[in-house]
Amino acid sequence: MLDELRCEACSAGAIGLTSEEQQQLLSELDGWALIHRDGIAQLEKRYRFKNFKQAWAFSNQIAELAEQEFHNPAILLEWGNVTVTWWSHSIKGLHKNDFICAAKCDALT
């Protein structure tokens, strides 16, 4: 399971995933979308909560996860919603780390 793996160091010289690899890993996730923003492949998911306080608490859990994995997402916190977007800045695309962290986000809910 992806959520049981750890992220590995990803430098600018790392190789991003192929489209086929992205699709295979995406099939292991629930509710995540593969998007392209400014020509960069990213993973994105919106989580829904009953109120702002629950959404805020979840955002803090993601922040802790990001610190543990040394990999940082974009987090949009709104009333009752948290949108999480993962991609590897150093390679301007997707790495296995992004899928690992996406799975770990799901494990928090």
From Swiss-Prot:
Keywords: Lyase. One of its GO terms (biological process) is tetrahydrobiopterin biosynthetic process. It is an enzyme of class 4 (lyase). Gene3D superfamilies: Transcriptional coactivator/pterin dehydratase (3.30.1360.20). Belongs to the pterin-4-alpha-carbinolamine dehydratase family. NCBIfam families: PRK00823.1-1. One of its GO terms (molecular function) is 4-alpha-hydroxytetrahydrobiopterin dehydratase activity. The lineage of its organism: Bacteria, Pseudomonadati, Pseudomonadota, Gammaproteobacteria, Vibrionales. HAMAP family: Pterin_4_alpha. It catalyses: (4aS,6R)-4a-hydroxy-L-erythro-5,6,7,8-tetrahydrobiopterin = (6R)-L-erythro-6,7-dihydrobiopterin + H2O. CDD domains: PCD_DCoH_subfamily_a. It comes from Vibrio cholerae serotype O1 (strain ATCC 39315 / El Tor Inaba N16961). Its EC number is 4.2.1.96. This is Putative pterin-4-alpha-carbinolamine dehydratase.
